[in-house]
């Protein structure tokens, strides 16, 4: 029964914001978000500390800062409406929380796409034990 509950919770999160954000990342970078960015550098993935390791990691740092600003909107779980039009991401929600979360994800996906050339395999599955420098402020 516990396993069934865990799978149900995971499926709910997959249908929410993180899944949508992953689709945006794939659209802008051509890389699968789960395998390429879920544990990249010091900031891509859950949590974050230390100094961003490259421009791609800095995109995730800025995204974390954006999520901090919209924290009352439960950004990791809030789903929203958006579309792709000629490779542009259009956030289309009238709800202010959903729109704000979508904009955080949109800006991060664009940033990752613009900096895909900085992506370095050595930062994939990067241990947080390497992220010891003083954490920057948002």
From Swiss-Prot:
<keyword id="KW-0378">Hydrolase</keyword>
<keyword id="KW-1015">Disulfide bond</keyword>
<feature type="binding site">
    <location>
        <position position="47"/>
    </location>
    <ligand>
        <name>Ca(2+)</name>
    </ligand>
</feature>
<dbReference type="GO" id="GO:0050482">
    <property type="term" value="P:arachidonate secretion"/>
</dbReference>
<feature type="disulfide bond">
    <location>
        <begin position="66"/>
        <end position="104"/>
    </location>
</feature>
<feature type="disulfide bond">
    <location>
        <begin position="91"/>
        <end position="102"/>
    </location>
</feature>
<dbReference type="GO" id="GO:0047498">
    <property type="term" value="F:calcium-dependent phospholipase A2 activity"/>
</dbReference>
<dbReference type="InterPro" id="IPR001211">
    <property type="entry name" value="PLipase_A2"/>
</dbReference>
<feature type="binding site">
    <location>
        <position position="43"/>
    </location>
    <ligand>
        <name>Ca(2+)</name>
    </ligand>
</feature>
<feature type="signal peptide">
    <location>
        <begin position="1"/>
        <end position="16"/>
    </location>
</feature>
<feature type="disulfide bond">
    <location>
        <begin position="42"/>
        <end position="131"/>
    </location>
</feature>
<dbReference type="InterPro" id="IPR036444">
    <property type="entry name" value="PLipase_A2_dom_sf"/>
</dbReference>
<keyword id="KW-0732">Signal</keyword>
<dbReference type="GO" id="GO:0005576">
    <property type="term" value="C:extracellular region"/>
</dbReference>
<feature type="disulfide bond">
    <location>
        <begin position="73"/>
        <end position="97"/>
    </location>
</feature>
<dbReference type="GO" id="GO:0016042">
    <property type="term" value="P:lipid catabolic process"/>
</dbReference>
<dbReference type="GO" id="GO:0005543">
    <property type="term" value="F:phospholipid binding"/>
</dbReference>
<protein>
    <recommendedName>
        <fullName>Phospholipase A2 EC1</fullName>
        <ecNumber>3.1.1.4</ecNumber>
    </recommendedName>
</protein>
<keyword id="KW-0442">Lipid degradation</keyword>
<keyword id="KW-0479">Metal-binding</keyword>
<keyword id="KW-0106">Calcium</keyword>
<feature type="active site">
    <location>
        <position position="105"/>
    </location>
</feature>
<feature type="disulfide bond">
    <location>
        <begin position="44"/>
        <end position="60"/>
    </location>
</feature>
<dbReference type="GO" id="GO:0005509">
    <property type="term" value="F:calcium ion binding"/>
</dbReference>
<dbReference type="InterPro" id="IPR033113">
    <property type="entry name" value="PLipase_A2_His_AS"/>
</dbReference>
<keyword id="KW-0964">Secreted</keyword>
<dbReference type="GO" id="GO:0042130">
    <property type="term" value="P:negative regulation of T cell proliferation"/>
</dbReference>
<feature type="disulfide bond">
    <location>
        <begin position="65"/>
        <end position="138"/>
    </location>
</feature>
<feature type="binding site">
    <location>
        <position position="64"/>
    </location>
    <ligand>
        <name>Ca(2+)</name>
    </ligand>
</feature>
<feature type="binding site">
    <location>
        <position position="45"/>
    </location>
    <ligand>
        <name>Ca(2+)</name>
    </ligand>
</feature>
<dbReference type="Pfam" id="PF00068">
    <property type="entry name" value="Phospholip_A2_1"/>
</dbReference>
<dbReference type="InterPro" id="IPR033112">
    <property type="entry name" value="PLipase_A2_Asp_AS"/>
</dbReference>
<feature type="active site">
    <location>
        <position position="63"/>
    </location>
</feature>
<feature type="disulfide bond">
    <location>
        <begin position="59"/>
        <end position="111"/>
    </location>
</feature>
<comment type="similarity">
    <text>Belongs to the phospholipase A2 family. Group II subfamily.</text>
</comment>
<keyword id="KW-0443">Lipid metabolism</keyword>
<dbReference type="InterPro" id="IPR016090">
    <property type="entry name" value="PLipase_A2_dom"/>
</dbReference>
<dbReference type="GO" id="GO:0006644">
    <property type="term" value="P:phospholipid metabolic process"/>
</dbReference>
């Amino acid at each position: 029964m516990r396993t069934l509950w865990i799978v149900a919770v995971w499926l709910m999160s997959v249908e929410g914001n993180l899944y949508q954000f992953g689709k945006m990342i794939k659209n802008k970078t051509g890389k699968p978000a789960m395998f390429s960015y879920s544990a990249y550098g010091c900031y891509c993935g859950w949590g974050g500390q230390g100094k961003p390791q490259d421009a791609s990691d800095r995109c995730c740092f800025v995204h974390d800062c954006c999520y901090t600003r919209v924290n009352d909107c439960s950004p990791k779980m809030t789903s929203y409406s958006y579309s792709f039009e000629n490779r542009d991401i259009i956030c289309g929600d009238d709800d202010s929380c959903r729109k704000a979360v979508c904009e955080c994800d949109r800006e991060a996906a664009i940033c990752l796409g613009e900096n895909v050339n900085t992506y370095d395999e050595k930062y994939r599955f990067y241990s947080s034990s390497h992220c010891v420098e003083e954490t920057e402020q948002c």
